[in-house]
Amino acid sequence: MKKNITVLMTVASILIVLGATLFLITACSASSDSSGLFGSKGVETAIDVTDDFNKINIVTDTADIRFVQTNDGGCKVVANDKKNIKYSVTVEDGILKINSADELRWYERIFNFTKASLTVYLPESEYDSLTIDEHTGNISVPSYFKFATTDIKLSTGDVNYYAKTLESLTVKASTGNVTIEGESSGTVNAETSTGDIILNGAVCEGDINANVSTGDVIIANSTCKNLNSHGDTGDIKLENVTVAENVQIERSTGKTELINASCANFDTDADTGSLYMTNVIASGSFTIKRSTGDVRFDGCDARDIYVTTDTGSVKGTLLTEKLFNPRSDTGEIDTPKPSGTGACDITTDTGDIIISIKQQ
C-alpha cells in the first residue's frame, strides 16, 4: 500500500513539473521573448511635450514617480515599464495629463517583476497645481519646485515631498510613509492607514492635519494656525512647534511627546499611552485625559490645567503658582499650596500626583 502511494506521488510530481514547463513554453511563445514574460527588463518610452501648461495631472497604476528640472527649457516624460503598459501624454486646457493603460496578459501579471518608473522633466519651477493618483509606487517631488496646490493619493508606496506649496497640500496613502519637508504657506493634510508621517519645516497660515491608523507622527520646526492629529496606534512627537491657536491630539494607543512648543490651547485624549511635555506653554489651557498612562511636565505652563487619568501618575514642574486641586484614590499627593489665579485640577484613580514650581 505504501509503495503504491509513493508511486502515485512520484507520478503526480512529474505531471506538475511537465505542466509548468509546458505553461512556460507557451507563455514565452505568446510573449515572443522570455524577458518580456519575466520582466527582467523594461521598455523605455520618451515623449516630448511642446505645448504650454501650468497644471500637472498624473494617473498611473504601478510606477515610481519623480520630477526633474531641465536646463534647456524643454519638457519630456520618460517611462520605463513593461512593453504592454502604454503611456499617453497630452496637454488639454493648460493641463499636462499623463496616464498609463494596462494591457498586460494574465500570465504577464503573474511573472511581472519589472521595476517601473516615470520621470517628468519640467522646464519651469512654479506651477498652479500638481495632482497624482497612483496605485503602487514611490513618489518624490524635489525642493526646487513650487505649486499653488498639491493633491497626492497613493495606495501603496512612500511619498517624499520637498517642494513649496502656496495654498493647500494634501497627501493620502493607504500603506506607506509620508515625508513632507519645506515651506507650505497654506494648509497641510497628511493621512496614512499604515505608515509614518514626518513633517518638518512647514510654515502655514492654515492648519496642519496629520492622521494615521497605525503609525508614528513627527512634526518639527513648524508653525501653523491649528494642529490636529488623530490615530489608533502609534507615537506622536512635536518639537519646536508654534501654533497660533489650538493643538488637539487623540490616540488609542501610543506615546505623546511635546518639546519646545507653544499654543493657545492644548487638548489631548488617549486610551493607553504616556504624555511627556518639556517647555510647553499655552496662553489658554491644558486639557489632558488618559485611561492608562503617566503624565510628565518639565518646565511647562498654561493659564489653566486640567488632568484626568484612570491609571497613571502625574509628576513634574510648572512655571507659575496655581490654585492646585489634586485628587487621587490610591497614591501619594504632593503639590504646592493653592496660590495665584489659574486652575490646576489633577485627578487620578490610581497614581501619584507630585508637582512643584520650577525655579527660574
Residue ranges and their predicted role:
Residues K2-T60, D64-L154, N160-A173, N177-T192, ...:
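Acidic (Asp/Glu) and glycine-rich low-complexity loops/linkers
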Residues N260, S274-A282, D294-G299:
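C-terminal amphipathic alpha-helical segment
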